């Protein structure tokens, strides 16, 4: 991984869009969407800061009973892995809802995977089941 020209920015996306005309080939937005008041605006901002044929990666929590039990009750209240109040269930997004936003903005969905956590091993692992937490890869395909 020598000679990579990586420019890490610690700045809000809104401010970055205002600050620069630069556009990116790859964008990651991980474990953020469920914490913002307007997820669709964030997704659109992510689209606007990327090049015409960019790859975008998003991860978030699915909205269903098992996700609520694991992510809020389990992680925040039983295991105390996360501070209480970290998540608000109403902000969780079902993959189908996420797909609709992406398609509406002309993104092509390439892949979706589940992200699971093994409490005993204290390790995350990938699965084909996006029931609780998931990561998706989509691509801009604008000419």
Indicate residue ranges for each PLM-predicted region.
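Core SAM-dependent methyltransferase catalytic element
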Residues: 122-143
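Conserved SAM-binding loop
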Residues: 1-68, 95-98, 136-142
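Residue-level marker for beta-strand->alpha-helix junctions and adjacent short loops that shape enzyme
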Residues: 63, 117-119
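General small-molecule cofactor/ligand-binding pocket signal
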Residues: 7-9, 110-113
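Short low-complexity, flexible loop/linker segments enriched in glycine and/or proline
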Residues: 1-4, 73-74, 124-128
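Short alpha-helix
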Residues: 89-112
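Acceptor-substrate binding/catalytic loop of class I
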Residues: 60, 79-97
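Short, flexible, mixed-charge acidic loops at enzyme active sites
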Residues: 67-77
């Amino acid at each position: 991984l020598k000679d990579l020209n990586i420019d890490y920015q610690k700045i809000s996306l809104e401010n970055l869009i205002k600050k620069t005309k630069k556009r990116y080939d790859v964008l990651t937005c991980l474990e953020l969407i469920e914490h913002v008041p307007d997820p669709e605006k964030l997704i659109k901002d992510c689209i606007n800061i990327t090049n015409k044929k960019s790859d975008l990666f998003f991860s978030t929590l699915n909205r269903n009973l098992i996700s609520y039990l694991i992510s809020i009750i389990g992680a925040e209240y039983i295991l105390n892995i996360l501070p209480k109040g970290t998540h608000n269930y109403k902000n969780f997004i079902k993959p189908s809802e996420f797909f609709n936003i992406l398609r509406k903005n002309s993104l092509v969905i390439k892949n979706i995977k589940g992200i699971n956590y093994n409490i005993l091993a204290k390790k995350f692992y990938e699965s084909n089941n996006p029931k609780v937490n998931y990561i998706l890869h989509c691509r801009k395909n604008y000419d």
